[in-house]
C-alpha cells in the first residue's frame, strides 16, 4: 500500500513538470472519469464484499463465485457496448471521445479486477490482493519512465500505460484466483436471483461511495464546464497532492474491515476509541508539513503556482475525510449500516452541488 502511494507521488510530482499544462490537464480529465467507473457495477461487487466478508477463502462456494464471475463479465460487456455507441453518436470533440473510449475500456478491466481483489480482501488474503494492486502501479510507472526516455509525453501514451498496467494486474488476479476462474462451463449456474441479491445488498454502499466522490467531483465538473481545460488540470493537481494521504488511509480501512467483522460486538467501542485517537494524532501532525511542501512545490511547479494556493483549503480536509474513511465508514460497513452512509454522503453531495452552482454560475469565482 505504501508502494502504491509512492508511485502515485511520482506521477503527481514529476509528470506535471515534463508535460505541458494542456496535455497534463487531459490526463487529469481521464483520471477524473475513472473515479466513477465503479458506478457501472451497480453495487454487485460491494454486495459480495458485504455478504461474504469475514469468511475463509477455502470456505467459498467455487461454483457460485464462478457463475457470478461469468454473469458479471457479461454484464460489463453489455454496458460497455451501450457506452461505446453513445460516445460515437453524441461526442464530437476528438480528445473527449478518445478519453471516453479509454475510460470505458478501463471500466471493464478495473471492475472485473476489483471483483477478485474484493474476494481476496474479504477473506483476509491481504498479501495477494496487495500484489495485484502493486503490480498494476509498478508496471504503469515503469512504462511511463520508458516513454519519457523515448520522449513521448502525450496524454494518450499515459492513458495506454495506465490501461496496460490494469490489464496486467487483471491477468495476475486470474492466476491467483485460478481455482475460481478456470472451471468447466458445465459448472456455470444461471443464478439471476443471487446476482440481484448481491446488487440489492451492495447498491446502497455503491451509491454512498459515488455520492462521496461526487462531493469533490461536482466541484471539478463545475470547473471543467465553466473554465478551460488548463484551469481544470491545475486544480486537479492540487486535489491529487492532497489525495495522496487518502490513498494510504483507504488502504488501511480495507485491512481493518474483515478484522472488525470478526470482532465481538462488546469490543467494538474500545477499538473505535483507540483508532480514532491514534488517527487524529497522526493526521494533525501531518498538517505541519503543509508550509514546507507548499514552498517546494511553488519552486518545482511554477506553472501551477496560481492553483497551489488552494492547498491551504484542501489540505486540512484530509483530516476529516481520513477520519470518515478509516474509522466511521469502516465501522458502519461492518455493522451493515450502508443506508446511513448513503444518507450522509447524499446530503453533503447536494450541499456541494448547490454551492458549486452559486460559485460557478453566479459568482464565477474559483
Language-model region placement:
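Membrane-water interface segments that mark the loop-to-transmembrane alpha-helix transition
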Residues: 1-4, 29-30, 34-89, 98, ...
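Helix-loop junctions and terminal segments of transmembrane helices
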Residues: 41-57, 242-266, 275-278, 328-334
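Membrane-interface junctions at transmembrane-helix termini in multi-pass inner-membrane proteins
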Residues: 53, 109-132, 316-346
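C-terminal transmembrane helix end/exit motif
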Residues: 48, 117-122, 126, 145-151, ...
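Membrane-interface helix-loop junctions in multi-pass transport and translocation proteins
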Residues: 16-23, 93-96, 123-131, 138-170, ...
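Alpha-helical transmembrane segments of multi-pass membrane transport and lipid-handling proteins
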Residues: 46, 66-93, 171, 249, ...
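Interhelical loop/hinge segments that connect adjacent transmembrane helices in multipass membrane
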Residues: 127, 155-162, 171-216, 255, ...
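Signature of the first transmembrane helix
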Residues: 1-43, 203-229, 357
